[in-house]
Amino acid sequence: MASQIPYIDLHTHRNYPVSALEVRSIKNVALNHSELVTEVDCSVGLHPWYINGNTEHDLGLMANALERKQVLAIGECGIDKTIEIPLTDQQSIFDKQVCLAQKYQKPLIIHCVRAFEEIVSSLKRLDFKEPVIFHGYRKNWILGQQLIRKGYYLSIGQHCLNGSQDELLQHISLCHLL
């Protein structure tokens, strides 16, 4: 009998494993949101919602954390045009995280709200070569297709159950969906 591939929860905030359900979880750790790297597989990132005056310190914590084998990715990181933090600050911090991901050869888990052009432009300008996952993708199939053609992946959540992403779900290949 062939072994089954476990479900991978790419982005969780749970502090406990769900092994009984054959789920492999990657915990999200926001270093600037009072969390520490744990002994479970995780990603670390400076989420745009929590950017503050300690950014350089937080980037140092991130660089140290990236030395640990449990840290599998950088994220959530990205740009959110609906928050009050200046776009230039968000862009600068995002770019620094992209550079760290490149240096440590880690995938990026992207938080993107109304900033697809800025994020894709940064990834191209910085010649980023590692995997890129657009977390919580809620846009249409046309944009999704453009991102997939660039080699990026999309992750979706429960919002896809309301019918707003039926076209995306009908067309996207499972190899591009996380």
PLM region spans:
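Mid-domain alpha/beta scaffold segments of enzyme catalytic cores
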Residues: 1-178
